Every structure is written in C-alpha cells, then in structure tokens.
C-alpha cells in the first residue's frame, strides 16, 4: 500500500509538472504569436503611412509639372514676364522663367544675372531638352538663398525644332515638413531619399543631400 501511495504521488507530481510545463510552453507560444502579430501590424501600418505620404508627394509634383507645361502657351508672347509672374503666384513657385534656344531668357521678376548667363547650358534646360518632355531636377541647394529646391521644366519643341524650355523653381519646405510629420510609432520617423540615393528630407537637416550610406555611420 505504501508503495502504491508513493507511486501514485510520483505520478501526480509528474502530471502536475507536465501540466505546468505545458502551460509555460502555451504561454510562451501565445506571447511570441502576439508579438509577431504586433510586429506585422506595425509593419503594415508603416507601409500604409509611407504609401499615403508618397501619393501626396506624387500629386504635388504632378500638379507643379502640369502648371509648367501649361505655361508653354505664353512662350512666344511679346512680354511673357507678366504671364510668368501669374504662373509663379498661382503655382506657388519661388520663380518661373523661360530659357530660349538663342540663349535669351525671361524671369517672372527682375533678376541680376551675369552678362554671360546662358540658359541653354543650365542643367534644367539640358535635362528637359534631352528628355523631350516634362522633367523635375534632382533637389539642390539654391545659390541665392541656400534653400533646398527642385526645378520643374518642359521643353518647347524638340530636336532641331527646340525653341527653348519653360521652367519653375519650388522650395522643398512643404515636402520636408510632410515627411517630418511621419511617425507611425514614438520610436520611428520618416525620411525621403532620391532615386540616386541622396537624402532629401530627414529629421537631421545636416544629412540633407548626403548619401543614404551616411545613415549607417550614426
């Protein structure tokens, strides 16, 4: 009888131990599953947020490009500066201008430029002429006010019939602010990178136009 009691007790202890172990395993599995689901949920939320902001930026760029393309109608006006000023104000450009194939140019406001200024030698002119359609330049720091800008440009004519290029500059402040507002979680933040791997918008402004590889150095 004593032996049976001892054996029964051992079995009960073993059973209890197995139950506790099973509960611990189940608890761990549930924890890992919940954590994985939370991580998936955060990833999906982050992707949705990034997509939404990307669509906003794309729409912003599309609207600017459309306005510049429409300005071509005034390209051969006797006094295009008035039309350019209206375009600048309506499209919220910092400046709008025409560069002609004969190297003449007209801006939406009075500009003091070097006597040898040649619009056909400018990157925006060359990029639009080569593309044969509307383009947007890579972001760059404006020499006049040290602000981050991009240029939207559209060629007038093509090839041997190229008459010139219509263009407008836009400050990137609104885009940078939009990206800075991205924060799916308190520990995360958004940043914008160009197609050539340069940082356009980041919470650390010192990284502006730096290679994305610089982030790994921090």
Please annotate each region the language model reported.
Residues 107-182, 186-189:
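Extracytoplasmic/periplasmic ligand-binding sensor regions of membrane-associated signaling proteins
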Residues 3-36:
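Extreme N-terminal signal-anchor transmembrane helix of membrane signaling/transducer proteins, especially
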Residues 78-92, 127, 165, 169-210, ...:
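Solvent-exposed, extracytoplasmic
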Residues 32-39, 177-180:
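Juxtamembrane transmembrane-helix termini
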Residues 44-137, 182:
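Extracytoplasmic/periplasmic sensory segments of membrane signal-transduction proteins
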Residues 100, 157-158, 194:
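Short, acidic, Ser/Thr-enriched surface-loop or helix-capping motifs
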Residues 104-105, 162, 198-199:
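Hydrophobic "anchor" residues
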Residues 30, 38-41, 45, 49:
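Long amphipathic alpha-helical coiled-coil rod/stalk domains
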């Amino acid at each position: 009888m004593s032996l049976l009691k001892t054996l029964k007790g051992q079995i009960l202890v073993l059973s209890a131990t197995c139950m506790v172990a099973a509960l611990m395993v189940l608890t761990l599995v549930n924890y890992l599953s919940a954590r994985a689901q939370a991580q998936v949920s955060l990833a999906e939320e982050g992707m949705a947020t990034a997509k939404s902001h990307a669509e906003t930026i794309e729409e912003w760029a599309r609207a600017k490009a459309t306005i510049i393309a429409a300005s071509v109608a005034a390209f051969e006006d006797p006094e295009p500066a008035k039309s350019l000023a209206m375009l600048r104000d309506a499209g919220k450009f910092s400046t709008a201008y025409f560069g002609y194939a004969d190297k003449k140019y007209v801006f939406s406001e009075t500009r003091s430029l070097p006597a040898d200024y040649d619009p056909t030698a400018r990157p925006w002119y060359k990029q639009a002429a080569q593309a044969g359609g509307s383009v947007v330049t890579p972001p760059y720091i404006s020499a006049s006010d040290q602000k981050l800008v991009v240029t939207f440009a559209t060629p007038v004519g093509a090839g041997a019939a190229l008459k010139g290029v219509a263009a407008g500059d836009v400050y990137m402040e609104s885009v940078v602010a939009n990206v800075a507002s991205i924060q799916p979680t308190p520990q995360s933040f958004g940043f914008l990178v160009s197609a050539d791997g340069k940082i356009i918008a980041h919470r650390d402004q010192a990284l502006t136009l730096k290679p994305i590889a610089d982030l790994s150095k921090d």
